[in-house]
Amino acid sequence: MEITSSLKKAFVEQIKIIYWQNKLTSTTLNIDKGKSVLEIEVIEIKLNSKNLDKMVLSKIDKCIPYHILFLLEYEGMYQAFISYKEIENEKIKVNKYYHTQWLEKENLPCKIEGLNMDSVYENFIRQIAGAELNVGSEEKKNLKEDIEQAEEKKQLEKQISALQAKIRKTKQFNRKVELNNELKKLKKMLEKF
């Protein structure tokens, strides 16, 4: 595990203390084991300020071969962080992080729901991500598909913003018409979400 000087600095300046608060397993929760989620670690990090470099969470996530729910605390307010983490053949792939706003601890959306460890983890992600993952139809899809769809939507929104900026800068009428047609196509694609 390589720790860069900037990561070391972030640990020292931004973190007051780290608690390994809980270990959620099928035995401790009295539910079935999951296919990919064996246990969920709950780690509380007390911060020196409201900001924490995401590199710190990513490094911790990559060092611990289990799924992790981070609870960040600053001056009595809490923020839940969780990533979509895939562990295959002892290789850890940490994807995008989702987080709540700063809330009082009892208001954090972290209810244990599910009949097995996979669904408990998936529900944590859905609760914490909130509207960010609630894209598309009401049809229940798997979490990976929802995350991919949310990323596609985000990319499409970026393309639309860039195209709108390009249209504003373009002087030629013919080129503006072309770009507007392209913009309409992208907006139609976005409506599908």
Where are these regions (language model features)?
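N-terminal, leucine/charged-rich tether regions that mediate assembly and partner docking
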Residues: M1-E75
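Peripheral peptide segments
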Residues: I43-N48, E90-K96, K144
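General N-terminal targeting signals
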Residues: N48, K85-N89, N180, K184
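Alpha-helix boundary/N-cap detector
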Residues: N51, I112-L115, S119, K144-I147, ...
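Extended assembly-interface/linker segments at domain junctions
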Residues: K54-E139
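Alpha-helical oligomerization segments
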Residues: S137-K141, D146-F193
